[in-house]
Amino acid sequence: MPLFGWMKWPKNDSYKPTHYPGSDIVTKTLLRELKWHLKERERLIQEIENEQKVKKTGVDYNWLRNYQNPHTTIPVTEQRQLEVLCSQVQPCQTGTILSRFREVLAENDVLPWEIVYIFKQVLKDFLSSSDRGSEQEDLEDSGSMDCSAPSVIQGDSSKRADKDEIPTISSYVDKNTKDRFPVFSHRIWNLPYYHPSS
């Protein structure tokens, strides 16, 4: 008889609170995108390093290598936090989050180990802004549960009419990332990518 046979261990998926139908698909989609960006950024850095080695030595030995460099992986605790955040996203909001994430990556020279932090910040910013939007909808007693755009409050329309600029996703990202990512936008030099020994 096993020593701990009487204990009921939690199932693997017990840490994921599913808030919306289809949130498993959303979680898989968002995490697949994050892992793809990690691999692509790592591959790009590896290519740049190889080009610099070829320029320095004058000889290309890349065809001799048959081993794979260690890939940047997401720690398990970080992965679970991301899964919990992703499960709070409605399926119709996935495209908005992905476009914001891609835009932040395109505007900043980001290293592979910074990508997970940026993705988490984009998720948190989106969820906090959608929470504020849902509070406004609750005040107006709009009981719809679908993914419609948040309605405009009457007092806000006069403020928006004065603006010459049409609000876009990029302006939202610019406003919200100025104070959060000062290191990424003000980087002056690029250090070589470091592969930690295992």
Curated annotation (Swiss-Prot):
This is Protein RD3-like. Residues 133-168 are annotated as: Disordered. InterPro entries: RD3. Pfam families: RD3. Residues 28-57 form a coiled coil. The keyword Ribonucleoprotein does not apply. Residues 157-166 have a biased composition (Basic and acidic residues). It comes from Homo sapiens. Signal peptide: none annotated. Keywords: Coiled coil.
